[in-house]
């Protein structure tokens, strides 16, 4: 699928586990477009944040079941990417947390 660079990365994931990975392994977590490939994620992160990406790992998270009264619905599945940066580089967006 042909995605624009700004459409690949949706938002950063800021959780306790993601923070531990960021500090220990230089891994940054993002929610990405469901159809984005690892190559597209790498290119998007390198262009948007001006860093060098060494590795990209992706996982698809299942959407949770949600209830409103007796009606049961489901949130959509989504994809997350764990991006490892070159030694000494960081993304300023995560530094304020």
UniProtKB/Swiss-Prot annotation:
This is Large ribosomal subunit protein uL23. Belongs to the universal ribosomal protein uL23 family. Gene3D superfamilies: 3.30.70.330. The keyword Coiled coil does not apply. InterPro entries: Nucleotide-bd_a/b_plait_sf, Ribosomal_uL23-like, Ribosomal_uL23/eL15/eS24_sf, Ribosomal_uL23_CS. Part of the 50S ribosomal subunit. Contacts protein L29, and trigger factor when it is bound to the ribosome. One of the early assembly proteins it binds 23S rRNA. One of the proteins that surrounds the polypeptide exit tunnel on the outside of the ribosome. Forms the main docking site for trigger factor binding to the ribosome. HAMAP family: Ribosomal_uL23_B. Pfam families: Ribosomal_L23 (PF00276). One of its GO terms (cellular component) is ribonucleoprotein complex. One of its GO terms (biological process) is translation. Keywords: Ribonucleoprotein, Ribosomal protein, RNA-binding, rRNA-binding. GO terms for molecular function: rRNA binding; structural constituent of ribosome.
């Amino acid at each position: 699928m042909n995605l624009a660079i700004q459409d690949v990365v949706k938002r950063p994931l800021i959780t306790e586990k993601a923070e531990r990975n960021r500090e220990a392994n230089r891994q940054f977590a993002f929610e990405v477009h469901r159809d984005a490939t690892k190559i597209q994620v790498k290119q998007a992160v390198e262009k948007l944040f001006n860093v060098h990406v060494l590795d990209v790992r992706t996982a698809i998270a299942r959407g949770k079941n949600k209830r409103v009264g007796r009606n049961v619905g489901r949130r959509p599945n989504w994809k997350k990417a764990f991006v490892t940066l070159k030694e000494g580089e960081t993304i300023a967006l995560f530094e304020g947390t």
